[in-house]
């Protein structure tokens, strides 16, 4: 079935934190609850680190594997903290993936994100807003792959890149790759 996580952290505590153990969802969707968006994430929301230094959604050696849709939204607070921060693979075998993060940095990924498998055409969308850092940062160890389209939208303010992509970005079956980055 479906898995829905909603959390709000305080100083030093992430809104939602997955650690050490894999998260596997068979036959369902995985959602970290979101909120209405105005220019990124406008207000506090489930999955938000409300006060102090913390990530909105943090993954530490806890691979995520889902058969259905993945929808994750996170808002971080304070210097150095991202809306979404993941060092583990995020995979949907038969669904689309949407990641939306806002914080000092928007979305930071150091492991692969993969939407779809085989001939199933599925899409990957990532939107990141960094108030003092990168909108989207993907390391060389973090290829962003979809069988369908890939859309990456990053807004970096002050000292960040809109899109800081060090790894591969690819569509393996049929889809467009759309990159949109802005830095101010």
Task: Write out the residue ranges for each language-model feature.
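Short intrinsically disordered, low-complexity coil segments enriched in acidic
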Residues: 1-8, 184
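Acidic/polar low-complexity surface segments
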Residues: 10-15, 31-57, 75-81, 124, ...
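Detector for repetitive beta-architecture
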Residues: 2-4, 15, 22, 27-29, ...
């Amino acid at each position: 079935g479906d898995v829905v996580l909603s959390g709000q952290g305080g100083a030093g505590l992430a809104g939602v934190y997955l650690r050490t153990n894999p998260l596997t969802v068979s036959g369902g969707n995985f959602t970290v609850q979101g909120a209405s968006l105005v220019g990124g994430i406008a207000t506090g929301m489930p999955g938000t680190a409300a006060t102090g230094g913390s990530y909105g959604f943090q993954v530490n050696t806890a691979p995520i594997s889902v058969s259905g849709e993945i929808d994750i939204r996170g808002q971080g607070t304070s210097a150095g903290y991202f809306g979404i921060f993941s060092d583990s693979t995020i995979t949907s075998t038969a669904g689309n993936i949407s990641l939306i993060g806002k914080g000092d940095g928007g979305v930071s990924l150091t492991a692969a994100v993969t939407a779809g498998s085989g001939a199933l055409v599925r899409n990957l969308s990532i939107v990141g807003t960094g108030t003092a850092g990168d909108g989207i940062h993907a390391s060389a160890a973090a290829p962003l792959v979809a069988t369908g389209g890939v859309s990456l939208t990053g807004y970096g303010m002050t000292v960040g890149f809109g899109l800081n992509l060090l790894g591969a970005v690819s569509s393996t079956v049929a889809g467009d790759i759309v990159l949109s980055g802005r830095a101010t």
